[in-house]
Amino acid sequence: MKMRLFLFLFFFCISLAEAQKMPSNRSSVYFTYGNTGANLREFNQMLDQKGLSPMRKAYRNFGFGYQTRYNDFVLGLELFQNNGPKSLFNGYELDYRTTRVYLNVGYSFTEEGRFQLIHYMSLGSGFMNFQMLRGNPKKTLDGFLQNPAHGFILRDGDIHKGSQHFAGFLTEIGFQLSYDIEIPGREEMVQVISKFGYSFSPFEDSWLMKDIAFGNAQSGPFLRFGAGITLPDHNFFYKDASLGLHLSYGLHFTEPDVLNAALVENGYRPFEGRPNNLGLKLLGESKGLLYGIDFYNLGLSGAATESSNHTLNSVRVYLNGGLKFFERRNLELGGLAGLGYANLRYTLTSTDKPDFPALFEEPDRDGHLKARGLMGKPELYVAYGIPLTNKNLFSMIVSLHGGYELPLGNYSLGGVGMSSYMANPYLQLSLGLRP
């Protein structure tokens, strides 16, 4: 149902842009940072009943956005990572984080120019992780697997299993102010952005975990500031420059053999199959030079025992640069090199946790191990563009990407190196929009 609504809004905006006589367009990519006010009311009430101080009423936002403007109509996509404040209770660290993805539809109150004022509405889904953990005293993987419990971990829309597990219905209404600053000698411009508005989790029963509603962690008034790169059409011949966003699905030809051996040795079931990913790819071009950003999320999950589940998750972010080798009509071939960041997290959770407040009083149920480091990759791609309008305002791009990921570190989980799992050949199929 949500996907149908997204597609309806997408093609509705296409038809509006197509109907206008003298189209102008621009594409922008940006990063933002800000704060959102939020009160975990039900959880804080439980703390108050126990004579404890409440959690602070705000969380931080770090966001990535892509936006395309056609005349006065705006279409975009945003990805947010939100981190709540940390609190200490009896040696346990209590905190939460959420991830959201939004499709934005908006309207500009200003003519195309350096200054823009846009009103927009967003529809999307999310993920929530709420945890209460103490330091894990077990220094080895075997020691952790023999006694993993050092707190509790609650998840809704668990993308540690894969991005397809995003859940819930989230909305946002806001305003965007931006101003373009020239880059000497370049047609691209720096865009300085501010955003303010309100995030909503509209359904009361959503984000209910262990008899407490955490929906306020997905809502609240926000103020964000940021900057990015914009490509206004009056600065460019679009055969020389473009900026497109792609939804990608990938297969990674690797398995966690080292971890599986340790799991079996300690009485757990191994992970089955290979990880796949669902992610976003930004790919821009300026006079034959390519640049871009990749975000994707690998997940494996399954039953560990009769009373526990486990996940193996890795989020990867790459900055890419390269060259376009060949272009003829709608077909193109290019190569990219990427340098990025990756984490690796193994989580073991009990399936029979009690509800609050009993869970708060006896929290030792779950545990996790994590590692992080740098990654590199070479990549080749072939793409084909399909014009979507008679005026050739933008094209749908179908691409096939292939490459090899190289871990620049050991990625140790409890002293066991996982670099052999992180190193892998991969294939990705992407579908995108490019002006």
Regions found by a protein language model. Give the residues of each.
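Short glycine/proline- and aromatic-enriched beta-strand/turn motifs that initiate or cap beta-hairpins
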Residues: Q20-N71, W207-A213, G220-K287
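Bacterial Sec-dependent N-terminal signal peptides
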Residues: M1-S27, F115, A227-D233, L331, ...
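Predominantly the C-terminal beta-signal and adjacent terminal strand-loop region
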Residues: Q176-L247, Y381-P435
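Transmembrane beta-strands of outer-membrane beta-barrel pores
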Residues: Y33-N39, Y70-D72, L79-P85, L123-N129, ...
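Extracellular loop and loop/strand-boundary signature of outer-membrane beta-barrel proteins
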Residues: L47-L52, S87-L94, G157-Q164, S206-G215, ...
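Gram-negative (and chloroplast) outer-membrane scaffold detector with strong preference
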Residues: N71-L154, H165-T171, K287-L359, D366-Y381
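Residues on the lipid-exposed face of transmembrane beta-strands in outer-membrane beta-barrel proteins
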Residues: F64-T68, L103-Y107, M121-S125, T171-I181, ...
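Residues that define the transmembrane beta-barrel architecture of outer-membrane proteins
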Residues: N25-S27, R56-F62, D95-V101, F115, ...
